[in-house]
A protein has these predicted regions:
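A helix-coil-helix interface module used to build multimeric assemblies
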Residues: 4-193
Length: 194
């Protein structure tokens, strides 16, 4: 079998990223490797800021006005940044360590932060970062993609239920005819269940 296939929609590991990409594209910003990197950067930076706010004695001198600049690192995280993280990872052979080094490079770019760089990832394991990133990915994808789409389905069902509330239909119980109902009432049951 061919070992080094170029990645595209036909060679993706799953049809979710191939055949069904048009249906799942909105989820890429939450579940792609790029997204995981962005969430990891966010967790690392917010943790660093939290250490500054404690204040951890060694970080008392960190200029708090730079917090927004630090947050811009994940807010503006790009595919180019993700590619750079992959380059770092090719040397470190460790995905979370590559994120740490990436953030240290950003500290260098800001300038004057050398004394604080060793507190990036301070007291953490990779799983601390992952076990925070993954729930955030799930929570935000549900809130920003899934629930709004589900609400559209519920709204459409409720609209049909209202429109069809006067249309009579025979109900059944245990496969036998029962008291009459309305099509609208029965459709509203499905909206309620969702």
């Amino acid at each position: 079998p061919k070992q080094n296939m170029e990645l595209d929609i036909l060679t993706a590991v799953s049809p979710i990223d191939g055949r069904y990409r048009s249906k799942t594209a909105a989820l890429a910003q939450y579940y792609s490797e790029y997204a995981l990197m962005k969430y990891r950067v966010r967790v690392e930076i917010e943790y660093f800021i939290a250490l500054c706010e404690l204040p951890l004695p060694q970080l008392e001198a960190f200029p708090h006005h730079l917090f927004d600049t630090l947050r811009d690192v994940y807010r503006n995280f790009s595919e180019k940044d993700a590619s750079h993280v992959k380059e770092i990872e090719s040397v470190t052979n460790h995905d979370v360590k590559a994120i740490e080094y990436f953030i240290k490079e950003k500290f260098d770019a800001i300038g004057g932060l050398d004394n604080f760089k060793e507190f990036i990832h301070f007291g953490l394991t990779s799983q601390d970062i992952n076990n925070t990133s993954f729930p955030m990915m799930l929570k935000e994808s549900l809130a920003e993609v899934y629930v709004p789409l589900l609400q559209r389905v519920i709204d459409a069902l409720n609209a049909r239920a209202e429109e069809w509330k006067e249309i009579p239909m025979l109900a059944k119980t245990h496969g036998q005819p029962a008291s009459p109902t309305s099509l609208g009432k029965e459709v509203r049951v499905f909206a309620y269940r969702l």
